[in-house]
Each structure stands twice: as C-alpha cells, then as structure tokens.
Regions:
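Structural signal for hydrophobic packing residues in well-ordered secondary-structure cores
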Residues: 91, 95, 110-117, 121, ...
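Residue-level signal for inorganic ion chemistry
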Residues: 66, 87, 102, 124, ...
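ALDH superfamily catalytic-core signature
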Residues: 244-247, 277, 285-429, 456-457, ...
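Rossmann-like NAD(P) dinucleotide-binding subdomain of oxidoreductase/dehydrogenase enzymes
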Residues: 156-323, 448, 517
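Residues at or immediately preceding the N-termini of alpha-helices
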Residues: 63, 77-80, 99, 117, ...
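Glycine-rich loop-to-alpha-helix module at the N-terminal edge of alpha/beta enzyme cores
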Residues: 61, 65-171
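Hydrophobic face of amphipathic alpha-helices that form TPR/SEL1-like repeat modules
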Residues: 1-69
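Conserved C-terminal structural/oligomerization subdomain of aldehyde/semialdehyde dehydrogenase
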Residues: 1-3, 64-70, 95-100, 250, ...
Length: 541
C-alpha cells in the first residue's frame, strides 16, 4: 500500500507563528461584514444540479442576535424522493469514474474551500454561534478530511486487488478435497452501495458534513444531503458546501442538497428503499429510531452513525493540576458545551478535589460570554430554546439534589440570543444528570478515593465516545488505557481533556451507545464502511 502524504491545514496556528494575528482578525471581520450583506436572501434546494423550490420556506435566524440569516425551502417527502431518484440515476455513471479522478475532484474541492475559508468560517460563526477560532478550525478540518480521504483512496488503489495467475496456481493446485484444479484469476474489490442519505448536525455543519459526504462520494456513492433544518438550523453552511463542490467540478447529481423538517425529509431518507445507506451524526435516540424504522421493517441499509457522548475525565492525585484545569475547562465549556465530545463529568481524587475546584472556578470566572464574533469572547449563545430549557431544568435539578459551585445563571448581553454562564456542580454519581447527555455548559465534579472505582464510574454510562486522564503515574496510565471504554482517549492533554481530534492523527470513533461500526472518522478504516467487498473468480482453462 502506498503512503498517504497528508498534512493538516492549521490556519490560525500558521498566522500566529508568522506574527500575523492582526491580519487573521482583519480577514475574519471582513468576511463577517460580507456575510451579513447577504442576510435575508431566499435560497433554493439543488436536486440533480437544478434549482428546486418547495412553495413554502423555513426562516433561519442567527442564535447570536435573532437576525434573519435567510429563507430556505421547506422540502417535503416528495422532494426527498426527487433527490433520491436523481442520486440513483447519477450513481450509474459516478461509480464507474476512475478512483484517481474522484480523488482529484475532492483535492480540488479542498483547494476551493481553502481559498474561501474565511468566508465560510464567518457564515459558520453567524449560523451556529462559534467563535472565530473554532470556526476557522472547523473549516480547516473540512479541508483536512477532503485531502486525507483522497490520499487514502489513492494509497489503497481504489480498494481493488487482483491475484496473479501464478499465485492462484500455488493456492489451488491441490484443488478441493485434493482433486486437480485449474488456476483462477481472482479480483477482490470494494464496491459502492449506491445512494447515501447524509443527515448532518448543527454543531459541526462544515467539518462533519464534509467528512460524511466525501466519505460516501469519494468511494463511488452519490449523496442526498440534509443539513440541520428544524430546531437547530444550519442550512446556509450546507448550501456553501454544495456551491463549492460544484465549483470544484463535481458532476451534477452526485451531491443533492435538500432542506426541510426531519419528520418529512429526514424520515424519507431513512425509510426509502432507494437509499442504500445512512450517515448520521446526532442524538442516540434519533439514531436508534432510524435503525428501528429500517432493520425492524426488513429494510436493510449500511448505517454509519455517531450518536453522542457523556464523556468523562479522571484527575488523579498524581496529576499536574494546572494542565488538568486547562484541559477540563476547554473540553467542558468550549462552544458552550455543544459538542458530542464535550466533557460533562470529571472524577477527581479526594486529596486534590478542593484545590482543583478552586483553580477551575478561578479560570472559569475569567471566561468572557457574549457575541462570538468578538475576538475576545470565549462562550457564545446556546443554539436554541430547547437547549436553553434543558440548561435551566438541569440547574434546577442540581440545586435540588446536589451543590452548585459556580454559574447556573442566564447572562444579559444586550443581544437577543440565549446566553448562559458555564456551571460547575457536585452530584452523586447515581444522579440522572451524570448519565444523560445534556449538550449545555454544565460540568459535574465527583470525588473518588480508589482509582479503579474512578474508571468504573467513568465507564458506567451508555456512551463511549471520548475520555481523558491526568496522571503522572505510569501504573494509572496503563490501567486507564486498558480499562476505559471509549473510542478516543487523551492522557495528560492540557489543550483539552476530551475534544479536538486532529484528522490523520486521532481517529474519532464511538464505542457502546456512541457508535455502531467501531470505525472512526479521520482514520485509515473510515472509507471502507461506504463500500462492500466482492470476490470475483474466473477459472482459467
């Protein structure tokens, strides 16, 4: 197998290293002004390369201040069927495109996205409330996925292998049950399934959307893509992906963009027998419901799903507490806790718990909350009313059953968005909030005395996405590495305890209730999930 010569984009890091932070801020601020000029426009769906309107629209507002971002088509089941038919028709052509050409197209897409990175990042910040640093990092990740998967496809020669006649003769010379046999010419190839429905989340509408979509398309499948279109709307970033794919030369019909309620458009993608596979990132309940609707009805599909997390970290008595505080704060409160990899519970040895809490509260108090477009703001708004309600209800339960150590209040910013303080609390491990995914900036601190008990509690949830440890003790590191039930494990990582996977370096994979296939994004095994293996043997006379 050839080598994948891949390097990460790392835009902000490069600007800092070159002493150009002011230039970075200028480019981002200009892109924001440009993006706002387009606010209030009406947008189309794209099916088979054609603009399609639904007759009614969805109004998308920025979570920052309630400004109308745009009006998007309120697609129906019929529009989903149209998109599936268009994708199915194009599949007959796209699957036969040489893998080298497919790789070239998505390398071009990475280049086009890189040329537009600030414009796309600005739209992303306005649409879901991320800071400029998180937004540019997410666009970088989309670029990385495109280049990495192109490299993997090339390194694996399109996932096809042929057995030479001489090798075949050696293997089958004895034949079956000792009987003589002629040599066989054998080809083993991974073939695309067909049409994939890609159902994207609000929290990473660029990087995850690109990773899922390109995983399907680069391996020869076609896509019907539905961005988050209901409570948490991120439809404009999805449209930008569609537009940039076209600019990169992707044939019409390979990527079809539809918007509309999940109860109609999303459900049709799941139940329609013309869809051969589903790629989904979202809640566990939604993911399991999809599986029930398909496999339960005898409608088998390929399912590649990531279904959230309830991610733990352990802070040992042997930890560097400053590193632990830094990593815990970033993982728990970055993007207001609205990441599937966000840290939501931390188990701290009793001997250092009070010092850890004191240091954590001190650093948390310094975080600025407000308009994430401002360069000094760390925590922006919650994405929706439902997220705000979940935060308030959780704080009430903490006050009833535990101890609220810091935060828990709404924040007045002068904007119409939903802004809240990061909260730090103590609860018993058995409490429901310790086991339930919340997707808000609430961190539960739980003390422990025995390291084995800490690992046991960390594993005592339905999820298994990410986990972190802070310890300088080799025995504890070994015990944690061997015993933790999570697909992404970080040890002594000051930058973040549980978030921040880097394409090509870390795989991002969910165990237990967090995933299904056991293979993760940004890894050498991801693309294989979008294909099925076939062995073809031709006996030589």
């Amino acid at each position: 197998m050839a080598k994948n010569n891949f390097s990460n984009e790392f835009t902000y890091k490069k600007f800092i290293e070159e002493g150009k932070e002011a230039e970075f801020d200028r480019l981002f601020d200009e892109a924001v002004r440009k993006a706002k000029q387009g606010f209030g426009s009406t947008y189309h769906m794209y099916i088979g390369g054609k603009e399609v309107d639904a007759g009614s629209v969805l109004t998308e507002r920025s979570p920052i201040d309630g400004a109308v971002i745009g009006y998007f088509q309120k697609g129906t089941r019929e529009h989903a069927r149209m998109a599936i038919a268009a994708a199915k028709d194009e599949f007959a052509r796209w699957r036969d495109v040489d893998y080298k050409e497919r790789a070239r197209i998505f390398r071009r897409f990475a280049d086009v996205l890189a040329a537009n990175k600030f414009d796309v990042a600005a739209v992303l910040s306005l649409e879901n409330g991320k800071s400029r640093y998180e937004s540019i990092g997410e666009v970088d990740e989309g670029i990385d996925f495109s280049r990495y998967y192109a490299g993997e496809l090339e390194a694996n020669r399109g996932y096809a292998r042929k057995t030479s006649l001489e090798e075949s003769r050696q293997k089958v010379s004895a034949g079956f049950q000792g009987a003589p046999s002629n040599a066989e010419k054998v080809s083993i190839v991974m073939k695309p399934y067909g049409v994939f429905g890609v159902i994207a989340p609000f929290n990473f509408p660029i990087s995850i959307s690109i990773g899922m979509s390109i995983g399907a398309m680069i391996t020869g499948n076609t896509v019907v893509f539905k961005p988050s279109s209901s409570d948490n709307m991120t439809m404009l970033t999805g449209l930008r992906i569609c537009q940039l794919l076209k600019e990169a030369g992707l044939p019409e019909g390979v990527f079809n963009y539809i918007t509309g309620p999940g109860s109609e458009v999303g459900d049709e993608l799941v139940v329609n027998t013309g869809v051969s596979g589903i790629v989904f990132t979202g809640s566990r309940s939604t993911g399991l419901n999809m599986l029930t609707k398909t496999y339960g009805a005898g409608n088998q599909k390929a399912f590649i799903v990531e279904m959230g997390g309830k991610n733990p970290a352990i802070v040992s008595k042997n930890a560097n507490l400053d590193d632990a505080v830094s990593g815990v704060l970033s993982a728990a409160f970055g993007f207001a806790g609205q990441k599937c990899s966000a840290l939501s519970r931390v188990y701290v040895h009793e001997s250092v718990k009070e010092e850890f809490i004191s240091k954590l509260i001190e650093k948390t108090r310094a975080l600025k909350i407000g308009d994430p477009i401002s360069k000094d703001v760390y925590i922006g708004p919650l994405i929706s009313e439902s997220a705000y309600k979940r935060y308030v209800e959780s704080i009430d339960k903490i006050k009833e059953s535990g101890r609220l150590l810091y935060g828990g209040n709404t924040v007045s910013t002068g904007l119409k968005g939903l802004y809240v303080e990061p909260a730090i609390a103590e609860l018993r491990h058995e409490h429901e909030l310790v086991h339930k995914e919340l997707f808000v900036p609430i961190l539960i601190v739980i003390g422990y005395k025995n390291f084995a008990d800490a690992i046991s509690m960390a594993n005592d949830v339905d999820y298994g996405l990410t986990a972190g440890l802070y310890s300088k003790n080799r025995k504890e590191i070994k015990e944690f590495s061997e015993g933790i039930e999570a697909g992404v494990v970080y040890i002594n990582r000051a930058v973040s305890a549980t978030t921040g996977a880097i394409v090509g370096l870390h795989t991002f994979v969910g165990w237990k209730g967090s995933g299904l296939t056991g293979k993760g994004t940004g890894s050498k095994f991801y693309l294989q999930q979008f294909m099925r293996e076939q062995s073809i043997s031709i006996t030589q006379g």
